[in-house]
Amino acid sequence: MASCPDSDNSWVLAGSETLPVETLGPESRVDPESEEAPQALQDSSKADGKESAGTLNGEEMLFQTESSQGEGAALPEESEAKGALGGDDGHGTKRPGDTAVQEDLQETPMVTSLGPDTQDLERNIHPQNLPSSPRAVWKEHGCSSSDDDTDVDVEGLRRRRGREPSPPQPTAAVDGEDQAKGEGIGELGISLNMCFLGALVLLGLGILLFSGALLEPETEPVEEAELQVFPETELVQTVGNRQDEVEQLQASVPPDSVPSLQSMGLLLDKLAKENQDIRLLQAQLQAQKEELQSLLHQPKGLEEENARLREALQQGKTSHQALESELQQLRARLQGLEANCVRGVDGVCLNWGGSPQGGKATTEQGHKGQEPDTSLLEQHKQLEAEAKALRQELQKQWQLLGSVHRNLQRGLQDAGQGAPAHAGLAELGHMLAQTLQGLESQGINTGRSSNDSEAWHQKKPRFQHPREWSGREKWRGGQRDQKAEHWKLKKEESGQDRKKSWRDEGREFTGHWKENRPRAEESGSRKDSKRQDPKVHPRKSGNSHSGERQKHSWGKDNSPDSVSWEELLRRKYRPPQGCSGVADCARQEGLALFGVELAPVRQQELASVLREYLARLPWAGQLTKELPLSPAYFGEDGIFRHDRLRFRDFVDALEDSLEEVALKQTGDDDEVDDFEDFIFSHFFGDKALKRRSKKKEKQPWNHRAVGPREEHSRHPHHYHQG
């Protein structure tokens, strides 16, 4: 047996049929079809290798390329065998190469069965140690098999002359080209993976830088943070685009880069959370900004309040200075009275403000031991009592001024601490008004009527000493001697001086207070109206009292009727409390006064009632022509303004004006005593008047003596009744 496949002999299995065996030499001709078939198969294998290289990556493409090369090397043998079989079928005769074809067909399975082995060898052995082609592998296996067959029983086998082998194909070069292409494709796949990973790394760095830029504005000012925060819509679009890019990268990147995609997802989640925190911080900053703006607007109101408090403080200081100056004047006058007193041996003041000659005569009489007249002693006692009462009253005034001073200081302290000082200053003004009224009631006539208290809530004078009034009545009796008359004249002169000085002080003081309170302004206007006539002098006897009063009341105007209505229009009253609206205040006033609800009073109805009443008075013709129904008391709709003043006060003021006119025309004001009942009976009915009359009977004092009409009266003679 031959030990090498290059020998010219081969073995053929003898079949059941005895075939003629011919020993032939090597064929000089090779079938062209068998040569073209391997080349076509090689070309197809190369094309298949290129297509597989486009879809697979790296090492798998290289492995498949090598396996396809092995299969391509085996396919020429199969094609050659098929060509031989085709030739047999076509011609129906056997050619000399039939035995060779059969041998090739028998040997082809061996080659195909060696395919897996070659694949295993390629995996375990370096490519440089592999054979150049599968044909070489087949030759090696052929040699080994022929060597093994030498030991096997060759019975039934016949040896024949084989054909000359065809020249070897240049498979090595093709294999080198395929390997180079596979390596290039693998390198391309590796480079794509590296590009994907690099893009992911760059994207991650960009996101980190972007998130760092968003976190920086937390320590910057509010304005910069607001400028760097992106709008919500743009942020959502950016996040959505990045998520789409990440999904595309996940679909295109191999599974080896999955951990990097997970880290990118975590980064995106972190970025979304940070964006939410940024939006929350932005909302908080906006709220704080609005709060700061509101706080910036508040100082404006505080500045206005501080300005008002400063004005009130300044007014309090001026009033305090006025009180101090008045106190100093009182002290000076008291010292002057004590200095003008001429005392006797027993220390009793014998003469107040007497002339030096009279004082010397009295002193000489005292030294001579002559006893004074009994009437003179009585007068001295009375004067001493009056002086004592005056000292007591001055002491009370001193205490009152001290309390006012303390209250003023406390009010100024409260105003300095930011508390509203209007209430304290109003109370202080009220006390000062009472002080002035007390001074008027003491006999120190300042030329002012008791109606000045109307601006300070219509309070009655506090300081009225009965002993002083009795002393003044005794002076008016005219049963005094020459010295008493002389003392009286001196006292009246000193009273005039005090009146002038106090009038000036009161005018200055009222001028300060009327800037803050409209009622004080009203009071000051009345006081100025009283001072219009410079010819007015203080009364010196009871007979001249009426003329002085009328002159002081009407002034230079010769039409007292119109002046009365004008005085009525100047008056202002305290508005009703505890109600809102015209109808509500009218109803509340009716229930409080008569227990009957009062409908809002109309201007036409009240005018008709007034004309009806004035028609009964023969002297009230001028008053009927000009009724005091101005817009100050009635609105545009003709309804009485119950929410600004009470209807009862308005009726009382009308009655006071009518009493003044009646006193001027007839000398008696009893003719208009039924005016109030006439008006109320029209609006409330007779039942309400009866109920009111029952209430009057239960009262132990005279209603007219203390009613609001007496408080509003401008004549001081009301205080001297009884």
Curated annotation (Swiss-Prot):
Its main location: cytoplasm. Residues 1-180, 442-562, 691-722 are annotated as: Disordered. Residues 1-10, 442-453 have a biased composition (Polar residues). The keyword Coiled coil applies. Residues 88-97, 465-536, 546-559 have a biased composition (Basic and acidic residues). The modification Phosphoserine is found at S133, S144, S145, S146, S166, S559. It comes from the Eukaryota. One of its GO terms (molecular function) is DNA-binding transcription factor binding. It is found in: Cytoplasm, Cytoskeleton; Nucleus. The modification Phosphothreonine is found at T150. A motif (Nuclear localization signal) lies at residues 482-502, 686-711. One of its GO terms (cellular component) is transcription regulator complex. Keywords: Coiled coil, Cytoplasm, Cytoskeleton, Microtubule, Nucleus, Phosphoprotein. InterPro entries: CCPG1/PBIP1 (IPR051990). Interacts with ESR1, PBX1, PBX2 and PBX3. Interacts with TEX11. The C-terminal domain (AA 443-731) contains a nuclear export signal. Association to the cytoskeleton through a N-terminal leucine rich-domain (between AA 190-218). This is Pre-B-cell leukemia transcription factor-interacting protein 1.
